[in-house]
Amino acid sequence: MKMIIIIVKDGDADTLTQSFTANNFRVTRVASTGGFMRSGVVTMLLGVEDTQVDAAIKVVRDSLPASGDDKRATLFVVPVQHFEQV
């Protein structure tokens, strides 16, 4: 299992959330701030199986295409050692 952490600008968060939902991914959104100007950003957390990582990244690429050197999302894919729902 993997945890995908995605950081996007506030203005892109709704579009990406809708795209994840339409593609049967469950996402948790956390409001946060960051960057040089402390602008509003949203951090999204997705827990996915190893086989779903590429599909989740494709959703990001398709929903938020980069324009030139301007990238619209920062992604981290990290292993999950233990997952439990209580």
Question: Where would I find each of the regions flagged by the language model?
Answer:
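Positively charged, small/polar-rich N-terminal and surface patches that mediate targeting and assembly
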Residues: 1-86
